[in-house]
C-alpha cells in the first residue's frame, strides 16, 4: 500500500467555501469555517439574538 491517505482526524474536513481547515462548523452538516459562517449565516436563516 503506497501513498495511503488518512480519512480521519481534524485535518480531513475543510470549508466548502474557502477550503480552510481550522474553526470548522460541522453541526447540521454545514461544513463552513467560522469566518465564512459569520458572513453568510443570515442568508441561511440563522439569527443573532444578543
Swiss-Prot record:
SUPFAM superfamilies membership: Glucocorticoid receptor-like (DNA-binding domain)
Record-level Gene Ontology MF annotations: rRNA binding; structural constituent of ribosome; zinc ion binding
Assembly information from the UniProt record: Part of the 30S ribosomal subunit.
Record bears the keyword Oxidoreductase: no
GO cellular component term of the entry, any: cytosolic small ribosomal subunit
Alphabetical list of NCBIfam families matching this protein: PRK05766.1
Organism: Methanosarcina mazei (strain ATCC BAA-159 / DSM 3647 / Goe1 / Go1 / JCM 11833 / OCM 88)
Annotated GO biological process: cytoplasmic translation
Homology family: Belongs to the universal ribosomal protein uS14 family. Zinc-binding uS14 subfamily.
Protein name: Small ribosomal subunit protein uS14
Binding site for Zn(2+): 15, 18, 33, 36
